[in-house]
């Protein structure tokens, strides 16, 4: 587990852009009671591809006219139980961080794995998400 003072700016980068942080299993489970909404879960990470591509890309995607009703995040390696619970809802995709999941009516409809983030620019990540928003939101 990384020191919170290291992770705090990585959390705030998302929360200052309107993301709701999910730090408990209860918060994750409550999110899935929103059966009539679309929502995104970003699995945050301290790795370089989270900082260079994933966080900037997912934040950029929030500017699209069509977008999920809720933007949420869990922090892998920090909020372990919440992250594990979120990953259970992301089956059949293997655990990966960072990763991004879009849900509609409680069902996963789009997923971006770490290997799709690594080496890509933030605009590529944002465009990938925007296409999914335009289709599902």
For the regions a language model picked out, list residue spans one by one.
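Non-catalytic, surface beta->alpha helical segment in thiol-disulfide oxidoreductase systems
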Residues: 94-137
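Short acidic (Asp/Glu) patches
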Residues: 83-97
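Thiol-based oxidoreductase modules, predominantly thioredoxin-like and allied folds used
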Residues: 43, 66-85
């Amino acid at each position: 587990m990384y020191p919170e003072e290291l992770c705090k700016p990585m959390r705030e980068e998302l929360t200052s852009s309107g993301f709701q942080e999910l730090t408990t299993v209860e918060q994750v489970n409550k999110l899935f009671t929103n059966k009539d909404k679309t929502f995104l879960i970003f699995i945050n990470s301290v790795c370089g591809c989270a900082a260079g591509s994933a966080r900037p890309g997912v934040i950029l995607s929030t500017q699209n006219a069509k977008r999920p009703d809720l933007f949420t995040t869990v922090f892998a390696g920090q909020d372990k139980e919440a992250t594990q619970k979120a990953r259970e809802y992301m089956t059949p995709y293997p655990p990966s961080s960072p990763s991004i999941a879009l849900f509609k009516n409680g069902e996963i409809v789009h997923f971006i794995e770490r290997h799709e983030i690594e080496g890509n620019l933030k605009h590529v990540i944002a465009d990938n998400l925007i296409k999914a928003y335009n289709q599902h939101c």
